[in-house]
Amino acid sequence: CIPVANQPSIAHLVTHLADLGFTDIVITIGYLGDDIQKALGDGSLYGANITYVSEEVKLGTAGSVKNAQKYLEDAPFLVVGGDHMTDLNVLEFYRDHMASPAVTSIGLISIEDPREFGIAEIDANLRIRRFREKPAPGEIFSNLASTGIYVCDPMIFDYIPENTKFDFAKDLF
């Protein structure tokens, strides 16, 4: 847990999400899982109710979400990496997703040099037409980079294999 202002960075994230109304939080844990559980407890200190799902082997970003499916299959859900520090209004992003027919919405941001990120090309209706994870210099077709923040409809689970290492950016998009 990386400390920021005398708190683990994930505590800032949980507080931010709870302040926006995302109070039921599922955290998939593997590496440093015990430290994360000790730091956050049940989440009540941060205005949240936290459920932990252990990952015995590395399953990747989408695989770990699939591993937590039983806690996420009732409604669309937000996916945010535990190492994210953001002040983005993810509630607005969530609401935009709810108003669309999309199975998944990917948070995008315009940046100067997108080589270290997944990039997307969108059409006039904001639908993603192409996505490439960490493009080589000759493969860059957009400066819209993935934030690694997604809103997923539970239908997404139909596209993620069980007990398999599977990443949103590399394997699903």
Predicted regions and their residues:
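Conserved N-terminal catalytic core of the sugar/cofactor nucleotidyltransferase
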Residues: 3, 7-81, 90-92, 108, ...
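A structural signal for short hydrophobic beta-strand segments in well-ordered beta-sheet cores
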Residues: 1, 119-122, 173
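Residue-level signal for inorganic ion chemistry
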Residues: 10, 36, 68, 83, ...
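Acidic/His-rich active-site region of diverse nucleotide-sugar glycosyltransferases
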Residues: 60-62, 117-133
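Catalytic-core segments of class I nucleotidyltransferases/pyrophosphorylases
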Residues: 76-78, 85, 91-98, 112-114, ...
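A short, conserved acidic/glycine-rich loop-to-beta-strand motif
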Residues: 100-110
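Conserved hydrophobic/aromatic beta-strand scaffold that supports enzyme active sites
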Residues: 106, 119, 149-151
